[in-house]
């Protein structure tokens, strides 16, 4: 895209425990979408390195099966906790209860943090599917996800 800032899509690194916590929270949120935040280190330019140090399950303030908004109290708590750990909030995750693990048009419109990673967990089929994306200026780029033993 001409004139658009180029950016590298980091590899999202989750421990097995972090992956299981995210997926469990998504199931716990049914029939609504579930959501939460991710914290980790950033590079000198403010870009997430992809390493996740903390997963913060949150409350979907929308209480909806089709949309999500992380409750502002959860956001403030996560920001404060990440700061005490010398980390930054580096992303948000949410579930799709009836669709694939890809950002919806609403997700893309509401993606306000260009440095963040956007994780979508689809519960549409028997097995959950977790995928990660960068969303900048309406452009969606998929990132690799690596789940390590924990």
Q: Which sequence ranges carry the predicted segments?
A:
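Conserved beta-strand-loop surface patch within small alpha/beta domains used
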Residues: 1-89, 98-150
